[in-house]
Every structure is written in C-alpha cells, then in structure tokens.
C-alpha cells in the first residue's frame, strides 16, 4: 500500500474506532485541533508512560516536573520568544491563503534538489497550481496571547507557552537544591504547548495545541558535545526499541544558518510520513542550547543560576542538551508504522482481508480481550469473572457481539495483543484459548495459569 494511502487509511481508522475525533465536529470541526477518544487516550498515555520510564524513572540522573502553562510574561521576553519567535508569512494573491515562506522554499528544494532560482516567484500556488504570485514576507508571531484579570489591556497580557522548556529553566535552582542533584543531570516535563501555526494540518502532525515530551539535561561546558551525541543515539534507539522500522527513520542535521537563536547544534529525528509535499517529518529535535537559557534568565531575573563545582573549585553556567519530542507526531508515527494488511481464514473455509495494528505490546491501548464464545448464560458468569480479574492488571475489553472471527478482526485492527476465548469446554477443563495477534496462533491455557502466562508476555505493560 502506498504510504499516502496509509495516512488516509489510518486517519479513517482513527475516526471509526475512536482513537481521534475532529474537535467540535458537530459544529463543522477544525483543522487545527483534534480530540482523543477512548482508545486514543490509552495509546497516548502508553506512549507517555514509556517515554517517562525511559527518560526519568529508569535513570538516576533525571527527575520530573509539571510546570504551568501560563508563565510570567517576562519569562518569554527574557528567553527571546517575544522578539524572535516569528515566522515569515506570505499570502497567495490567487487564493488569498497564507503560508510560511520557509516551508514553501524547503518543499521546493526537497522536490527539485535545489532552491528556486527566483525565490518565491518560482513556486506555484499549492492549492491551484497557478504560477506563484505572492505578497512580500511579513513577520508573524507564533505566540498565542491571553489576558489575565478583568481588563484586556497590556498589563494583563500573557502568553500560552510555546514550549515546556522555559518552565524547567526557571525551576532549575529549585530542583537542583530540593532534589540534591548536580550536573550532569536532567529535568523532564510532559505537557501541553501552544503555537499560532499559520498552516496547521496533516492530521495530528501539526496543530496549534499539542503535547510535548521534553527533557533539559544540564552539563559542564566542554562536555556538551559528548552528551549531545549520547542523547541523539539514545532517543533514536527508543523509537526502534518500540518497534519502528529503522529504514523509516533518519537524522537531519540543521544547517548552521537555520539554527534557532539559542542553538549550537540541532539534530532532528525524522520519520518517513510521505506527506503530499514532503517525505520526511520531524518527530523530535535534540538541541545543544549551550548556556543561553540559564545565562539570560540569570540576567533577566537577577537570580544566580550558575553551579559551583566543589571538585574543581570553579563556578560555571551549565550547558543544556534538549531532546524535545511531539506526542501527537509520535502517536501518528506508531499508528502508521504498525498498520498492516494480510489475510485470515474465515468460517466458510476461505480467507478475508485482515487489518492489524502491530503495535508494540507496551503501547497497545487494550492488552487483552475476553470473548465468550456464546452469549448463553452458562458462559457469561465465568467470562465476566475472568475479565474482572484481568482488569486488576491490564486494560481489558469484553466483547460478546458477533461471530468469534469478526470479534478477532475488531481486536486486531486496534492492536490488542491477546484474545482470550471462553468456550463450553472451559466449563469442563477450566481452560481458555489464547490467541496471539500477529501470528494468530492459538494455545489452550489453564485458568489458574492464565495470569502468569499473560504477565510473561506483557512485561513492561
């Protein structure tokens, strides 16, 4: 299946099975926001749980925080966001739609292998294909404004955070002192951020409200490059360990002239989404932010955010290595990479097309489905009791509707690793049939061994 059709198919699957809904759909929806349904929120939470386990609880040198969405306005002035967090905006004189000029230029270069000789004049309108007819680029702020207090005036002006990082930086000293940490160490945060994107789109890839998984790792100057490479390698391996095919991932080195104002070096981990205009899309950036953040916040707040190294009797401002990942983008990637179509036998002796999400078991929204072979009262008590017992450990679905093959298909397409069938023999032999998602192999397991059988195969879930 072509990759673009996988995007369309996955989007339809998400809407049909309750992973993702258009925000405010009864009012026409919006391209810039999506709601996560029952299965979507489980997948999202499982991704966050694996990130937190990898980045925080499995390491002795990283701790977590949960910082406010609305910070003092001066934080964003000092960090440079108010001044430089802008994008070049152009308007098509054909359709009067607005686009980021840098995105148009990048897409042209990726398609043709070279930048446009005449700049924007060589770029056709993305919607109509007409020869380019563009306004001059204008600076467009990516910050979303809000007002606190009874009057919408300058005094009450605040910003919704465009990144979680600044909340970490302003708490650097608090965390270092209360947690008795010292560089090299990291502070992690998962939370909502907001950016006034000019052209949100590509499903949940680019939205104005999104969730980030960020960690700021504070190191001694001079050790930053080694730690930067460590986190590039570690983060790339995290995606592979969770089942992403290595050939669908790549590292993209930001050219020096395109680095953010705080960055010494930035490397993106990208996935082959195969969007209409570009093959690769950024999953996360790993940036060497130097000492920029702690230095400017020391100057802006008057608070000393340096570190005194007692071993060397030196005082220095830590450099920061930042792996920053987008949760929605990660979820979209896991769904696309796991989507698979094959054939499964049906009750008539033939085969049917089977859709299966081959998600890593740690990510699967539902871990086990309990399926009584019949709705008859003789099976119901045992099946319901079994489902209740398994729910103490995992997210369990209980489905009694339709033929057993159809119920298997329903679980396959949401990625459920194991289906447990309670049949009439179960009443006699106290055993159930356990079916594995990917191989469709079935084994008979005694009821008193079922919990241990599943636990061995759901480690880390």
UniProtKB/Swiss-Prot annotation:
ATP binds at residues 195-197, 205-210, 282-283, 326-329. GO terms for cellular component: cytoplasm. It holds the Pfam family HGTP_anticodon. It is found in: Cytoplasm. Substrate binds at residues 100, 163, 210-214, 322-326. Gene3D superfamilies: Anticodon-binding domain (3.40.50.800), Bira Bifunctional Protein, Domain 2 (3.30.930.10). Its main location: cytoplasm. InterPro entries: aa-tRNA-synt_IIb, aa-tRNA-synth_II, aa-tRNA-synth_II/BPL/LPL, Anticodon-bd, Anticodon-bd_dom_sf, Gly-tRNA_synthase/POLG2, Gly_tRNA_ligase_bac, GlyRS-like_core. PANTHER family: DNA POLYMERASE SUBUNIT GAMMA-2, MITOCHONDRIAL (PTHR10745:SF8), GLYCYL-TRNA SYNTHETASE/DNA POLYMERASE SUBUNIT GAMMA-2 (PTHR10745). Homodimer. NCBIfam families: glyS_dimeric, PRK04173.1. Catalyzes the attachment of glycine to tRNA(Gly). This is Glycine--tRNA ligase. The gene is glyQS.
């Amino acid at each position: 299946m072509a990759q673009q059709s996988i995007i369309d198919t996955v989007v339809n699957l998400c809407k049909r099975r309750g992973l993702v809904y258009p925000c405010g759909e009864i009012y026409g929806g919006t391209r810039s926001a999506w709601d996560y349904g029952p299965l979507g929120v489980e997948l999202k939470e499982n991704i966050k749980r694996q990130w937190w386990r990898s980045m925080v609880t499995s390491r002795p040198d990283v701790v977590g925080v949960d910082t406010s969405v609305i910070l003092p306005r001066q934080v964003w002035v000092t960090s440079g966001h108010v001044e430089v967090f802008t994008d070049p905006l152009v308007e098509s004189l054909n359709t009067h739609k607005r686009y980021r000029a840098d995105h148009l230029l990048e897409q042209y270069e990726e398609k043709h292998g070279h930048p446009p000789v005449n700049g924007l004049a060589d770029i056709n309108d993305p919607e109509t294909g007409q020869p380019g007819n563009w306004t001059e680029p204008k600076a467009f702020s990516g910050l979303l404004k809000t007002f606190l207090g009874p009057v919408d005036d300058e005094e009450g002006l605040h910003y919704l955070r465009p990144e979680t990082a600044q909340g970490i930086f302003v708490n650097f000293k608090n965390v270092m002192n209360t947690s008795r940490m010292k560089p090299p160490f990291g502070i992690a945060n998962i939370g909502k951020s907001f950016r006034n994107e000019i052209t949100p789109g590509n499903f949940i890839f680019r939205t104005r409200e999104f969730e980030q998984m960020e960690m700021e790792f504070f190191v001694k100057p001079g050790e930053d490059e080694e730690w930067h490479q460590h986190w590039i390698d570690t983060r790339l391996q995290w995606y592979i360990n969770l089942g992403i095919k290595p050939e669908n991932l790549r590292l993209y080195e930001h050219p020096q002239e395109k680095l953010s104002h705080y960055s010494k070096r930035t490397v993106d981990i990208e996935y082959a989404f195969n969007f209409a205009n570009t093959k690769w899309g950024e999953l996360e950036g790993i940036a060497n932010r130097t000492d920029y953040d702690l230095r400017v916040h020391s100057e802006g707040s008057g608070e000393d955010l340096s570190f005194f190294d007692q071993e060397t009797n030196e005082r220095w401002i830590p450099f920061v290595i930042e792996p920053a990942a987008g949760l929605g983008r990660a979820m979209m990637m896991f769904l696309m990479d796991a989507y698979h179509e094959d054939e499964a036998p049906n009750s008539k002796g033939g085969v049917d097309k089977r859709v299966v999400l081959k998600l890593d078991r740690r990510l699967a929204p539902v871990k086990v489905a309990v399926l009584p072979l019949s709705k008859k009262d003789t099976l119901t008590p045992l099946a319901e009791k079994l489902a209740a017992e398994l729910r103490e450990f995992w997210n369990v679905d209980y489905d009694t509707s339709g033929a057993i093959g159809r119920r298997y298909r329903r679980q396959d397409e949401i990625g459920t690793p194991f289906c447990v069938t309670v049949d009439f023999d179960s009443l006699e032999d106290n055993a159930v049939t356990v079916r594995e998602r990917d191989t469709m192999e079935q084994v008979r397991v005694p009821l008193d061994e079922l919990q241990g059988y599943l636990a061995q195969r759901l480690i880390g879930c």
